[in-house]
Regions:
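Short beta-strand or tight-loop elements
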Residues: 92-95, 111
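Hot-dog-fold acyl-thioester-processing enzymes
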Residues: 2-93, 158-159
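HotDog/MaoC-like acyl-thioester-processing domains
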Residues: 1-20, 99-159
């Protein structure tokens, strides 16, 4: 699988720039123990996310990031590198969210986005829908999380 490039920079990207079948790889974000613990204490206070010593005695054998934290890190990379800065209109939701492998302190995460389908809206012709399959990869290229997403984007042709 080879990575594609967009025909337009993120600041000038519209629906027409998202091509079905293209694959895009972005980012690198390093996970830290402090971030894992801080997120978990606030939003997912389970011992294997908040207490490095107690986490050693769990099935994970050590501290792991909350899946919701991993999802948030994915969104940061997705927003910074993939979503249009001027034409993104949000998303009606995601499907098939899966946390496949634990994410640990020191892991370096990137994302791979495969555009599976694009179509112009029939009810609102100023926009289109982009269906994507998103994978979060660690430094060993193992998929640690995946999901399907749909995004609404403005069309360039209507400007």
């Amino acid at each position: 699988m080879t990575s594609s490039t967009f025909s337009a920079p993120i600041e000038n990207r519209y629906f027409e720039d998202y091509k079905a079948g293209s694959v895009h790889e972005f980012g690198e974000l390093t996970v830290t123990q402090d971030e894992i613990i801080a997120f978990a204490k606030e939003f997912d206070p389970q011992l294997f996310h908040t207490d490095p010593e107690a986490a050693k005695e769990t099935i994970y054998g050590g501290l792991i990031a909350s899946g919701w934290h991993t999802s948030g890190m994915m969104m940061r990379l997705y927003s910074d590198h993939y979503l249009s800065k001027n034409a993104s209109l949000g998303s009606p939701g995601v499907d098939a969210l899966r946390w496949l492998k634990p994410v640990r302190a020191g892991d370096r995460l990137s994302i791979r986005v495969t555009i599976s389908e694009t179509r112009r809206s029939t009810s609102k012709p100023d926009r289109g829908l982009v269906h994507s399959f998103i994978e979060v990869l660690n430094q060993d290229r193992q998929v640690v999380m995946s999901m399907k997403a749909v995004n609404f984007l403005l069309c360039r042709q209507n400007l």
